[in-house]
């Protein structure tokens, strides 16, 4: 089920003539109580505040903050898990630093949090421009940061001797400028005997070790996990519940639906809007699953707009928990963090940026400074972030400037991620006319602009002011709302083929929008039709759907093409580009595939199964062993064919940055050499180098005239594993 915003009054779509019209639901109606069923829980609306606030702080703080160590590029909060892996860097580090008799639970007692100042934390979050935070109430180590009556494995009975969650929530809810406060909660615990059925052991001696503070219960979920979740909900009234560890078991094991229904109903009775992350798992719990209120990609950003609400989480460096082994160069710069926030918001996402406090409760100075830099930028430019929504498209593709768009009622914001110089070039489809006023936030003076020979809007910029990213505010007198158009039309069509879909026209603002006339233009020789030529006036949040059908000529050249959707609303006329690519057949679908090695039971065949889902939890991505030298994946097309190129779908979760600096090769003969240099320079091999991180998809073109039966993708990295969501080899059969 598609997630909907509480702002939206839509309850259904009815056919009126050839036009589908959204029927509004009165705000005053009291929604029914939620039932512990998938259908009922998935009908819960995304809170308005969550969609408006855009920026939150994630906090990973636990006993793992005592050793505060992990290999570069790893998660320090997974210290205990890595420590129990013989031969791992963490296993070796622990033995060398603490000795083989030192157990992980020693850190629980050593954790004092003696410098923890919740008021200071909250002030920092506010100064950073964040509107909410999510505290790790319990990570996979099992240490609860609240006074749990279910388990003595908490920060009141062990370590700090304080209810850390209570103190932070109280600080956040002081005064008028309150922060929304949420809990992360790990459903499973690595070594809880009540979950695993066995006592944890010393990884060096094999001797059993205690699991401090936790009771032994008969049913981990019924007697331990669910009661703890209810403690958090009933005792702390969180605004967000954010689960993790859901991948371990199916939804039928976790049984979270009852707790979530009670949480929603409690909020309903109290007139409160709350949100639950999809990892709380009532269906698949995959990071991109539309279940519950929002998706949760990790160290990944959607490649384009996703109308289903999502929130990307990541650390300032790679680890969520504090990792003293991460040097400054492993941390994102303030410029990169601002750019990431802008990019995410333009695609209908929120950014949940993690900090890892030290064991004593202080926040590392480097992390503090990054947050303050973001806050300084948001103080000037926040109107382009808070309370905005996505536009027709997220960015300017193919233009000279790297720009992201957001919209609020009748105002369009164009944010340049880099200073554009004397002129900023924007698309020809912008909603502007002769009276449009363009200013730069932080400057305020009206800027002159014109259209170039291609119809693009060219803005003459003021002297550079500010830092990180530059927001240009575009307003037209009398235009109170800007409509948004999205299309379900397929992104590709075969020569001579026909594709159909729907065009959705939405008023995302807070005021009524006037009627709109529609036209559709297509390249010469194409056929394109709309199911209606007019959209009636739309109230706030209303949408209409218009059928659309497109047929490509049989002799069309495989290339990207563009349809033009013309819209006239009042005196404003705009043309929106609808991209459609003509592709040759996918020759690799279902063909035999191999890879250098296989890790995590993820075979090479997954990359030719027709499923482009890039999330690991979906079970459709490949994976080699880890680490692996110059990892490769290859496919046998069955026969030689003229090849146009290869579309590669990257991972969309934690590991997208691994697929870069790679080669795509084609050959008439099988590849027989594991060495990259020898493989790509072998006789008859055509090889194309890709330096940047692959997209989803990323298209790699072969030189004209390339033929081949075998196609290989190979990393240059001496250690990174290769993981692919899908590979489509395009050519003529």
Question: Can you annotate each of these PLM segments?
Answer:
Residues 1-28:
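Secretory targeting and sorting signals
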Residues 136, 451-453, 462-464, 493, ...:
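Short proline/glycine- and polar residue-rich coil/turn motifs
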Residues 430, 471, 476, 584-587, ...:
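Aromatic, loop-rich ligand-recognition surfaces of beta-strand-rich domains
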Residues 505-509:
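Asparagine-centered strand-capping/turn motif at beta-strand->loop junctions
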Residues 555-583:
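Terminal connector regions
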């Amino acid at each position: 089920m598609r997630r909907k915003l509480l702002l939206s009054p839509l309850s259904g779509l009815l056919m009126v003539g050839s036009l589908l019209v959204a029927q509004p639901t009165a705000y005053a109606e009291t929604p029914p109580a939620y039932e512990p069923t998938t259908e009922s829980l998935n009908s819960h609306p995304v809170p308005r505040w969550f969609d408006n606030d855009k920026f939150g702080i994630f906090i990973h703080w636990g006993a793992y903050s005592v050793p505060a160590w992990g290999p570069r590029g790893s998660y320090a909060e997974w210290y205990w898990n890595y420590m129990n892996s013989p031969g791992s860097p963490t296993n070796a580090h622990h033995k060398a630093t603490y000795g083989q008799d030192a157990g992980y639970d020693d850190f629980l007692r050593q954790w004092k949090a003696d410098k923890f100042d919740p008021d200071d934390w909250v002030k920092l979050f506010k100064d950073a421009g964040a509107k909410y935070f999510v505290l790790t109430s319990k990570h996979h180590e099992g240490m609860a940061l609240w006074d749990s009556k279910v388990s003595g494995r908490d920060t009141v009975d062990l370590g700090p001797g304080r209810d850390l969650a209570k103190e932070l929530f109280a600080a956040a809810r002081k005064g008028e400028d309150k922060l929304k406060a949420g809990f992360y909660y790990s459903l499973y615990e690595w070594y809880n005997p009540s979950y695993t059925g066995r006592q944890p052991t010393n990884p060096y001696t094999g001797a059993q070790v205690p699991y401090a503070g936790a009771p032994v219960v008969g049913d981990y979920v019924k007697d331990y996990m669910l009661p703890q979740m209810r403690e958090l909900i009933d005792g702390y009234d969180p605004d967000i519940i954010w689960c993790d560890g859901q991948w371990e078991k199916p939804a039928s094991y976790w049984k979270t639906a009852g707790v979530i229904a009670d949480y929603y109903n409690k909020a309903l009775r109290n007139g409160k809007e709350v949100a639950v992350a999809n990892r709380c798992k009532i269906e698949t719990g995959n990071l991109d699953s539309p279940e519950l209120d929002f998706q949760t990609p990790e160290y990944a950003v959607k490649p384009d707009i996703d109308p289903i609400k999502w929130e990307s989480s990541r650390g300032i460096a790679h680890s969520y928990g504090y990792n003293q082994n991460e040097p400054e160069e492993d941390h994102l710069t303030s410029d990169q963090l601002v750019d990431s926030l802008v990019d995410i918001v333009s695609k209908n996402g929120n950014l949940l940026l993690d900090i890892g406090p030290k064991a004593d409760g202080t926040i590392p100075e480097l992390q503090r400074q990054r947050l303050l830099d973001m806050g300084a930028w948001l103080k000037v430019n926040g109107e382009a972030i808070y309370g905005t929504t996505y536009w027709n498209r997220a960015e300017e593709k193919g233009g000279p400037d790297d720009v992201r768009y957001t919209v609020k009622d009748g105002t369009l914001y164009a944010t340049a991620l880099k200073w554009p110089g004397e002129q900023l070039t924007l698309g020809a489809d912008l909603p502007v006319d002769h009276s449009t006023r363009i200013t730069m936030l932080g400057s305020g003076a009206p800027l002159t602009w014109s259209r170039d020979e291609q119809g693009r809007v060219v803005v003459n910029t003021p002297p550079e002011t500010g830092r990180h990213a530059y927001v240009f505010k575009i307003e037209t007198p009398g235009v109170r709302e800007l409509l948004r158009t999205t299309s379900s039309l397929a992104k590709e069509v075969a020569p001579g083929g026909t594709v159909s879909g729907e065009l959705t026209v939405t008023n995302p603002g807070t005021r009524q929008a006037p009627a709109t006339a529609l036209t559709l233009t297509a390249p010469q020789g194409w056929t394109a039709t709309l199911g209606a030529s007019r959209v009636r006036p739309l109230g706030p949040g209303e949408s209409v759907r218009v059928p659309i059908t497109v047929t490509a000529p049989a002799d069309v050249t495989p290339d990207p093409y563009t349809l033009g959707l013309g819209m006239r609303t009042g005196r404003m006329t705009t043309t929106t580009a609808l991209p459609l690519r003509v592709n040759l057949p996918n020759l690799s679908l279902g063909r035999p595939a191999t890879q250098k090695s296989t890790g995590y039971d993820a075979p090479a065949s997954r990359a030719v199964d027709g499923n482009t889902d890039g999330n690991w939890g979906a079970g459709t991505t490949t994976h080699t062993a880890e680490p692996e030298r110059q990892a490769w994946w290859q496919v046998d097309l069955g026969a030689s064919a003229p090849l146009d190129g290869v579309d590669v779908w990257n991972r969309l979760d934690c590991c997208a940055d691994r697929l870069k600096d790679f080669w795509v090769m084609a050959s008439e003969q099988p590849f027989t050499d594991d060495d990259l240099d020898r493989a790509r320079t072998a006789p008859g091999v055509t090889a194309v180098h890709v330096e940047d991180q692959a997209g989803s998809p990323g298209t790699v073109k072969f030189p004209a005239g390339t033929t081949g039966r075998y196609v290989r993708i190979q990393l240059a990295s001496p250690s990174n594993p290769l993981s692919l969501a899908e590979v489509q080899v395009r050519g003529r059969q």
